């Protein structure tokens, strides 16, 4: 079942299964807890899963729709700046003293406690796509950028499988650096 799922989704498997011949002749053990990463309730049936060396995938170039829409939004921003209309006027929108005092009065202990107790969500294919290409839209509003990126993601020419592979590799490695830095170091960029 597992191999069917992998072969349907990808063209090549990303791991290899090897049987342990010593345990094949014996009956399956009831509990075998010396398997790495296995709890005492799970059992090993003489299979070793070895990860193969990940392939170097090319980061696909940005979708033309994505580049066109980002250029259009930037043109809107520059035209509104030239006409004298400020997009965000912080001084009139917020009372800065209240804003700053609220953020400085929050307890540091509460902030640290909330960050340590929450689990980090695993990266999925769209999150990987969005994280990488969001750097092209620096300076745009997040809601505008999200709409543009979702349009590019749903375009038929977008290869979603490659972003799924990047996300799986990032989740498996769980590096301390961000996704963009990890991908730049482990994948080759498109021509």
Curated annotation (Swiss-Prot):
Localization (cell): Nucleus
Principal place of residence: nucleus
Pfam family, one: MATalpha_HMGbox
Annotated GO MF terms: DNA binding, bending; sequence-specific DNA binding
Effect of residue 152 to S: In strain: 7549
Record feature DNA-binding region, as residue ranges: 118-174
GO annotation, cellular component aspect: nucleus
Disulfide bond listed as a keyword: no
Keyword Thylakoid found: no
GO BP, sorted A to Z: positive regulation of mating-type specific transcription, DNA-templated
Keywords assigned: Activator, DNA-binding, Nucleus, Transcription, Transcription regulation
Family: Belongs to the MATALPHA1 family.
Entry function: Mating type proteins are sequence specific DNA-binding proteins that act as master switches in yeast differentiation by controlling gene expression in a cell type-specific fashion. Transcriptional activator that induces the transcription of alpha-specific genes.
Further comment: There are three genetic loci for mating type genes in C.glabrata. MTL1 seems to be the expression locus that determines the mating type of the cell, whereas MTL2 (containing MTL2A1) and MTL3 (containing MTL3ALPHA1 and MTL3ALPHA2) appear to represent silenced repositories of mating type information. Haploid C.glabrata strains can switch mating type, however, neither mating nor diploid forms of C.glabrata have been observed so far.
Name of this protein: Mating-type-like protein ALPHA1
Organism per entry: Candida glabrata (strain ATCC 2001 / BCRC 20586 / JCM 3761 / NBRC 0622 / NRRL Y-65 / CBS 138) (Yeast)
